[in-house]
Amino acid sequence: MPDPTRFVLLQPSHAGNVGAAARAIKVMGFGDLVLVQPRDADVQLHRDALALASGAADVLERARVVATLAEALDGISWACATAMTPRDFGPPTFAPRDHFASLATSGHAVAFVFGTERFGMANDDVYRCHACLSIPAEADYGSLNLAQAVQVIAYEWRQALGGYAVAPRTANATLADGTAVQGALDHWQRTLEHIGFLDPAAPKKLMPRLNQLLNRAQLTQEEVHILRGIARMVDGRRGRD
């Protein structure tokens, strides 16, 4: 099944931006990149493009080079231009997030079109699109690098499509059980008494507060071992003083 999302770069002049754009779309789960009349016809092989693509060399290699925007939009049913300012006679302008809320459920094959690094999109190219996206930014300086703009649009579109889950902890990490955490807490109490930081005759609320701190940290078993190892080291050095 063809990728229903396409990213189109119009006449990109810097190979590094092409590589960085390939990386930007890959990390958001997309892979269809089309280049319209790039300055360097062999830009996919350029060392700067390859360097900035990093692990996305496959997207860069598959990128298609075409002569016109019409070719780039073949098979696309909804094209979104990108521009800092709306055009007087162009398509309606939206912030990406606002437009994507409805576009994500439309079933369209979507293309996002980006202009040149220096001049952005020409009016005639904007007029070929169904909507124009403007990334909200500082009024006095809202110009983004090409690859940065691609990253923002790719991220917002992925979020509109459901996004990716963020793992709450390191993969395969095993949380320490209550006995292990309490053992670490008891060990630290002895160590703090040993170095004179905690007065057992007037402990106040130090240990309950440390207990809460460890609970919030959701320690793994390995982290408990580290804490106890630190306490043992402190005990050993104190014993030699």
Language-model region placement:
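Post-transcriptional modification and biogenesis factors for structured RNAs
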Residues: 1-241
